[in-house]
Amino acid sequence: MITFLDKENNPLSQKSYDSAVLCLQFHQLTCSCGHSGCLNVHGYYKRKVKSPSGSFLLKVCRVMCSECGKTHAILPSSIVPYSQIPLICCHQIISDLICGNKVVSVCDNYPDVDENNVKSVIRRYIRHWKEKLLSEHISLSPTDSLIRQCFSHYSMQFLQIHRTTNRLFVNTT
């Protein structure tokens, strides 16, 4: 999978995703096999994303490497891989937990996020990420820095739990 750094306060929608993917410099993307300039659009798949206005299906672009044949999803950094809950919502849950605030308050802003989703995010953080962040002195804020440091140290998006290869792409234009 390849994650591109998107604007921090840009609400995710199909239109914003499509626009961001169109602006990507595909010739600069690197496959997990190490080759650059070899990724071509292979297809799309749909995944559910929970947003403040409700859940929606996001059509995610997949690319295939012409060198090794592997396929990769192209995801914005506002998405946590293998989760329907966006990063900004997860970040709010964890921040509330750390500050001792009522963590279910996030459900007020995200109507499709229920208490079980909140518990799942907290469990994922405690089991897989809390010690990682502490050991590398990674702060939760700003989010952009959190994302970059998680990729730098662990080659994963914050709160990603599957060890699937994930590369961060920072568009230079």
Predicted regions and their residues:
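Short, conserved DNA-binding cores of transcription-related domains
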Residues: 1-79
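Long C-terminal interaction/binding lobes of large macromolecular proteins
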Residues: 1-12, 26, 134-173
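Intrinsically disordered, low-complexity regions enriched in small/polar residues
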Residues: 6, 19, 28, 46-47, ...
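Detector for Asparagine
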Residues: 9-10, 40, 101, 109, ...
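Arginine residue identity/basic-tract feature
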Residues: 47, 62, 123-127, 148, ...
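Short, positively charged, Gly/Tyr-enriched micro-motifs
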Residues: 69-159
